[in-house]
Curated annotation (Swiss-Prot):
It is found in: Cytoplasm; Nucleus. Residues 47-71 have a biased composition (Polar residues). One of its GO terms (molecular function) is DNA replication origin binding. It comes from the Eukaryota. Residues 250-266 have a biased composition (Basic residues). InterPro entries: DNA_rep_checkpnt_protein, Sld2. It comes from Candida albicans (strain SC5314 / ATCC MYA-2876) (Yeast). One of its GO terms (biological process) is DNA replication initiation. Gene3D superfamilies: 1.10.10.1460. Keywords: Cell cycle, Cytoplasm, DNA replication, Nucleus. This is DNA replication regulator SLD2.
Length: 354
């Protein structure tokens, strides 16, 4: 049976089962019907066998019957191709391979240290015509040369290294000394060991002992009391100078509230001194007072008569003559005149307006 026929039979049974029971068939329903169960298993086995087989056959490309002419090989072209990046024989170079030149060297091969055969090759023979045309030159191999004077070394050792050196001599200075003096001197060209204790730097025991004795004598002659007194005097002088400097500096006045009233400078009242009765003649003083009283009485008596005479004269004069005009005395004359145009008063008024 073909797979299509098996599938159609299974579908027909499923539609019939759905019409009867109003549901799709389950596994138990399929197992109950033996024929349908066999069809399901057969369909499954056929489908699984088809999947294992290759779906498409591999096509074999047969070579074409067209004959092509062979390409001639160019032996002169280099085998190693250079790309856009730096390469050597087709291989990309790194930073460390830049010293190599591409055609001769590669990062895998190292050049042998042996000399190349071209080094042992004979130089080309010179033509006789060329030798005749050339101008004669001075021979470089000089037979006689003036002797060079033996020079000393220009640089000198610094002073801080001279202390640690125990008469080291350079080869040149050693040779010069041999020429001047026949005495044999050892060629000492090695600096002394830095770890070795050097006796020349330290002091001798005698020097240390003498310095200790001097210090002991200085301590005996040294008076502590005198030193303390001199020190205290210096401190007292310093304190005096500081206090004097402080006094010279004027204290800074604090800012206070501005005036709200005008300042007036008034003279002080005279002090009432009690009259002293010493050296005073009381009788003369009493007589003067009595005479003054008499004069006042006489003047009072005479004033009544004068008033009567004046009234009669004024009445006659008022008929014929106009009364005399008197200038009016202002009240401000009784007070002290104000200094209105004083510049100080202007400043005061300006401050009061604020």
């Amino acid at each position: 049976m073909d797979i299509v026929e098996i599938k159609s039979k299974i579908k027909e049974w499923e539609y019939a089962f759905r019409k009867q029971h109003n549901k799709l068939p389950s596994k138990a329903d399929i197992k109950d019907d033996v024929e349908i169960h066999k069809l399901y298993s057969l369909y499954k086995s056929i489908k699984s066998g088809q999947q294992q087989k290759p779906s498409k056959q591999e096509t074999v490309n047969e070579p074409a019957s067209v004959q092509s002419s062979p390409v001639k090989r160019n032996d002169y072209s280099p085998r190693g191709e250079l790309g856009p990046t730096p390469q050597a024989n087709g291989r990309v170079l790194s930073i460390f391979d830049l010293k190599m030149t591409p055609p001769d060297s590669s990062p895998l091969k190292h050049k042998s240290d042996k000399a190349s055969p071209s080094a042992f090759a004979m130089p080309p023979p010179q033509s006789p015509v060329k030798n005749i045309i050339e101008t004669p030159t001075k021979s470089k191999n000089k037979s006689f040369v003036t002797p060079i004077k033996g020079r000393k070394i220009v640089f000198e050792t610094p002073s801080y290294l001279n202390k640690h050196r125990q008469n080291p001599q350079t080869p040149d200075s050693h040779n010069n000394n041999n020429n001047n003096n026949n005495n044999t001197v050892i060629n000492f060209s090695v600096s002394p060991s830095p770890f070795k204790t050097q006796r020349s730097i330290g002091k001798r025991l005698t020097e240390v002992y003498n310095t200790s004795l001097k210090e002991a004598e200085d301590l005996k002659s040294f008076n502590l009391e005198e030193e303390f007194q001199s020190h205290e005097e210096q401190e007292s002088e310093e304190t005096e100078t500081t206090t004097n400097n402080d006094r010279k500096i004027a204290p800074r006045s604090k800012r206070t509230q501005k005036r709200s009233t005008r300042r007036v400078k008034m003279a002080p009242r005279p002090v009432n001194s009690k009259p002293s009765l010493e050296n005073v003649n009381l009788q003369d003083h009493i007589t003067k007072l009595e005479e003054g009283e008499r004069k006042q009485l006489v003047a009072y008596m005479d004033s009544d008569e004068d008033d009567e005479n004046r009234d009669g004269e004024v009445g006659i004069a008022s008929v014929f003559e106009s009364p005399t005009k008197k200038t009016r005395m202002p009240v401000s004359n009784n007070f002290k005149r104000l200094k209105i145009n004083d510049p100080r008063s202007r400043r005061f008024k300006q401050r009061m307006r604020r």
